[in-house]
């Protein structure tokens, strides 16, 4: 009995020694999906992912200034590539983990029609977008308005959020009547679950390919490598699919 208890204690100590922690900077559009992935990762690996949500552009600046992030889940491909060229991400570690979708959304039923014709009506109220200078979903929103020939009509009605999470908050709270948000923020199992929305056709803007990268600070952290490997696996991919992402 004593030998069994000693063996169990040793096993638990070994597992504890192997378990680690990884600091993850995740694009704001990932919202609930990344929390589900982090929970599943902890359950399946024993490692803990500490997730910070924010705009990709601001994370880029923070990593340059020495922020202790070890993994970046960006909302674009350019930022991980730039970090790699700057020596701040591990060469060859980048991969596309998701393709985001944009949706024009209102928290109210019947405001946004299934074809987005509300945009062609005289502007009523504010239209929320993420800051296009730092947020890829904000750039996609501007590209969409431009491709529809409606950017000038809506320019004075735009309200810019710091990131896509804040853009969603503006609409959900009623501070903006409509807004361009990430499909992942308002969808469950392929359909908009609250309010009304128009899923923007993919040809209306450049693809929102979202890349992950192992940052230089995480190069020697087994938990960071394990998290990226988990992100490639079916458990994480299933969560992302359910959240409306393309893979």
Regions found by a protein language model. Give the residues of each.
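Bacterial N-terminal signal peptides that target proteins for export
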Residues: 1-6
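Exported/periplasmic ABC-transporter solute-binding proteins
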Residues: 20-53, 57-67, 74-77, 81-247
């Amino acid at each position: 009995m004593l030998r069994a208890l000693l063996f169990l204690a040793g096993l638990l100590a070994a597992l504890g020694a192997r378990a680690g922690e990884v600091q993850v900077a995740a694009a704001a559009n990932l919202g609930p999906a990344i929390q589900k992935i982090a929970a599943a990762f902890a359950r399946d690996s024993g490692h803990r992912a500490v997730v910070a949500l924010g705009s990709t552009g601001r994370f880029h600046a923070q990593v340059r200034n020495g922020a202790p992030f070890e993994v970046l889940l960006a909302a674009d491909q350019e930022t991980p590539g730039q970090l790699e060229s700057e020596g701040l991400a591990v060469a060859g570690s980048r991969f596309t983990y998701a393709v985001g979708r944009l949706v024009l959304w209102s928290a109210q039923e019947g405001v946004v029609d299934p074809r987005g014709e509300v945009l062609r009506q005289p502007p009523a109220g504010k239209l929320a977008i993420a800051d296009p200078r730092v947020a890829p979903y904000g750039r996609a929103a501007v590209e969409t308005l431009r491709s529809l020939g409606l950017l000038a009509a809506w320019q004075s009605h735009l309200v810019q959020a710091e990131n896509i999470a804040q853009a969603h908050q503006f609409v959900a709270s009623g501070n903006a009547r409509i807004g361009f948000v990430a499909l992942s923020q308002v969808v469950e199992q392929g359909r908009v679950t609250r309010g009304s929305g128009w899923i923007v056709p993919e040809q209306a803007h450049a693809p929102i390919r979202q890349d992950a990268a192992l940052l230089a600070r995480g190069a020697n952290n087994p938990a960071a490598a394990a998290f990226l490997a988990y992100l490639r696996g079916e458990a994480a991919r299933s969560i992302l699919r359910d959240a409306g992402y393309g893979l």
